[in-house]
UniProtKB/Swiss-Prot annotation:
Belongs to the universal ribosomal protein uL23 family. GO terms for molecular function: rRNA binding; structural constituent of ribosome. This is Large ribosomal subunit protein uL23. One of the early assembly proteins it binds 23S rRNA. One of the proteins that surrounds the polypeptide exit tunnel on the outside of the ribosome. Forms the main docking site for trigger factor binding to the ribosome. Pfam families: Ribosomal_L23 (PF00276). One of its GO terms (cellular component) is ribonucleoprotein complex. The lineage of its organism: Bacteria, Bacillati, Bacillota, Bacilli, Bacillales. GO terms for biological process: translation. Part of the 50S ribosomal subunit. Contacts protein L29, and trigger factor when it is bound to the ribosome. Gene3D superfamilies: 3.30.70.330. PROSITE patterns: RIBOSOMAL_L23 (PS00050).
Length: 95
């Protein structure tokens, strides 16, 4: 099994993701090869919480061009993790 910190890359901080935090839904950018079970186990291991559901979205790389050179940006994979109602919250920000 992979190390949990290799599966979870970073939290996604957007206006929509901060609104979802009130519903105990947290958004993370994850490894493109990780599946839902690996994401669930990694979140539970890193943060010590109980995960109820994991939704995953794939993003293709965007076409970019610099002068005569062209290519694609890296593809991404985003996971929205829903915690159980009795689980503690994840502290992403230090207040």
């Amino acid at each position: 099994m992979k190390d949990p910190r290799d599966i979870i890359k970073r939290p996604v901080i957007t206006e929509r993701s901060t609104e979802l935090m009130t519903e105990k839904k947290y958004t993370f950018e994850v490894d493109v090869k990780a599946n839902k079970t690996e994401v669930k186990d990694a979140i539970e291991a890193i943060f010590g919480v109980k995960v109820a559901k994991v939704n995953i979205m794939n993003y293709k790389g965007k076409f970019k061009r610099v002068g005569r050179y062209s290519g694609l940006t890296n593809r991404r994979r985003k996971a929205i993790v829903t915690l159980t109602p009795d689980s503690k919250e994840i502290e992403l920000f230090e207040v």
